[in-house]
Regions:
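Flexible, surface-exposed loop regions and adjacent strand-edge segments
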Residues: 109-120, 169-178, 229-233, 305, ...
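Residues that define the transmembrane beta-barrel architecture of outer-membrane proteins
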Residues: 50, 82-88, 93, 135-139, ...
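Loop-centered beta-sheet repeat module
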Residues: 170-225
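A gly/proline- and charged-residue-enriched helix-loop-helix capping module
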Residues: 102, 107-144
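Extracellular loop and loop/strand-boundary signature of outer-membrane beta-barrel proteins
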Residues: 124-129, 183-190, 221-225, 259-260, ...
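Transmembrane beta-barrel domains of outer membrane proteins
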Residues: 50, 54-60, 89-93, 100, ...
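Outer membrane beta-barrel transmembrane domains
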Residues: 204, 209-216, 223-338
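N-terminal, post-signal peptide beta-strand-biased segments of exported outer-membrane/organellar beta-barrel
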Residues: 21-106, 220, 292
Length: 338
């Protein structure tokens, strides 16, 4: 008879055998104000409705109901290649089910000349830049299954509708400010939408104060006009001091188990963070950092907070600032949780 630990390890092993191919990515660090305030170290923590994105199994440890409306934006734009991700989302979790809608706009620009330097200036960009923008609407349904006491598995089956937009610029048009070029990419319209069905899966083991999880996203790697949403696998661990009779403090660590291609280069992220409810169920503070161990090896520091404006109604927010690629981000959400 298998123990809970062996069940958990068997599931992890199955996820790790999934092959990865380099492609454009839909970033983990696009969704969830709590997650982003903690630097993106959330796979083992995910217990609100953003678990529909971060780790479907996390809903098993969540409240009776969690509902969030979110607006967020992230950008890496000091030099080429540069990118921006914008998000509007609705998510709802009420174990053992969840539903979600994520609307993302992923825009990137890069020099079209193969000889252009990585930190291309305006003169270098005058030779030409390519602008790519992918708008994706994702509708998801999340279901849970209890493997054994303290160990759950979850899956989000999702329908995606995506439209890719491409434009090449040269001369003075290409030499504009990077922020203006990203704005132009965000404004691209037209094109034919394409639909695809995909699935995210995850497992979570919660044993006392210790939580361990692993999740795999975009298993079928859908593509839209040649832009593929790359499969990603991430593992996380967390310690919940309150569950051990201590402070209402959670610390966490996440690690990408495979590198993946993003607009600004290859990524393989290590993230850590913490969440402290300085006034339980009223005020929470968060902080974290993440490091890219591949590609540009950029570093990003994040902070966030939640404030209850009335019982069970929270306003969540976060901000991020980074080095190397000039990454920055912000987000705000209204969340009902009880």
């Amino acid at each position: 008879m298998k123990t809970p630990v062996s069940h958990f390890l068997t599931t992890i092993s199955a996820l790790l055998t999934i092959g990865i191919q380099p492609a454009a990515a839909q970033p983990f660090e696009a969704v969830g104000m709590r997650a982003l305030g903690m630097g993106g170290a959330f796979v083992a923590v995910a217990n609100d409705s953003s678990a529909t994105w971060w780790n479907p199994a996390g809903l098993a440890t969540g409240p009776f109901l969690d509902l969030a409306l979110t607006r967020a934006s992230g950008e890496s734009g000091d030099a080429l290649p540069a990118s921006r991700t914008g998000l509007w989302s609705f998510s709802l979790g009420t174990p053992p089910l969840g539903v979600s809608y994520y609307r993302l706009r992923i825009t990137d620009i890069r020099a079209t000349s193969p000889t252009a330097p990585a930190e291309a200036g305006r003169e270098d960009r005058a030779a030409g830049v390519g602008i790519r923008s992918l708008s994706v609407s994702q509708f998801g349904a999340t279901v849970l299954h209890t493997i054994t006491t303290g160990v759950s598995a979850g899956a989000t089956v999702k329908y995606l509708r995506g439209t890719a937009h491409v434009r090449d610029l040269d001369g003075t048009d290409a030499a504009g400010a990077i922020a203006d070029l990203l704005d132009e990419g965000d404004d691209l319209s037209g094109g034919d939408g394409e639909g695809a069905v995909d699935i995210d899966v995850g497992v979570l083991a919660a044993m006392g104060a210790v939580r361990v999880g692993v999740t795999a996203r975009n298993l079928r790697e859908p593509s839209f006009s040649g832009r593929r949403l790359e499969r990603q696998v991430r593992a996380g661990a967390a310690f919940d001091a309150a569950a051990a009779g201590g402070l209402p403090l959670t610390v966490s660590l996440d690690v990408d188990l495979r590198r993946y291609a993003a607009a600004t280069g290859d990524r393989r992220v290590v993230a850590f963070g913490g969440e402290h409810w300085v006034r339980p169920q009223r005020v929470a503070l968060r902080g974290g950092a993440r490091f890219n161990t591949a590609g540009e090896q950029d570093r990003t520091v994040t902070a966030g907070a939640s404030v209850a404006v009335r019982a069970a109604l929270f306003v969540d927010g976060y901000g991020a600032v980074g080095a190397k690629t000039g990454e920055s981000g912000w987000g705000v959400a209204a969340r009902v949780s009880f």
